[in-house]
């Protein structure tokens, strides 16, 4: 177990290999403002997507999602995305689509819509539809084999979350 800010953050598992799956990467402890996180091989550095709230506790309506790194492969420190990562790789765009509802898109994969809205529990969640199944998204794993920084060879994307109607954990994998 790895402590960060006096909290256990994740349980370390086996290192990434060519047969890596989402379950071989560390699962993060719950965090009240985190919407979901992304992990990808070849290392355990994790991209965090969390609610962007002001000191008054209100959601920033212009930029409702804050994205940053937890650099586990280094010292486990929090680090902001750099300009290239934010604008071309891991950043998101947000557009209001209703009261307390936002269309969220990855800058690197705009054709996959995500929705930020309040769930039945009254809290904000990111919802995604994969293979005709809606889920409240909790984590994404991206399997990369070769390619370049600008054009990685993505073998698959695996998403985990919960079914909003049953509360059961679901997992879906697709090839982008």
Predicted regions and their residues:
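Short, low-complexity, Pro/Ser/Thr/Gly-rich segments in the mature regions of secreted, periplasmic
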Residues: 161-176
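Short, hydrophobic/aromatic-rich segments at coil-to-beta transitions
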Residues: 33, 156-158
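Structural signature of eukaryotic scaffold interfaces centered on beta-propeller domains
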Residues: 24-28, 40, 94-97, 149-151
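A generic structural motif
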Residues: 39-40, 160-162
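Predominantly extracellular/secreted and cell-surface proteins with exposed
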Residues: 70-122
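Generic detection of short hydrophobic beta-strand segments and adjacent strand-loop junctions
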Residues: 49-51, 112, 172-176
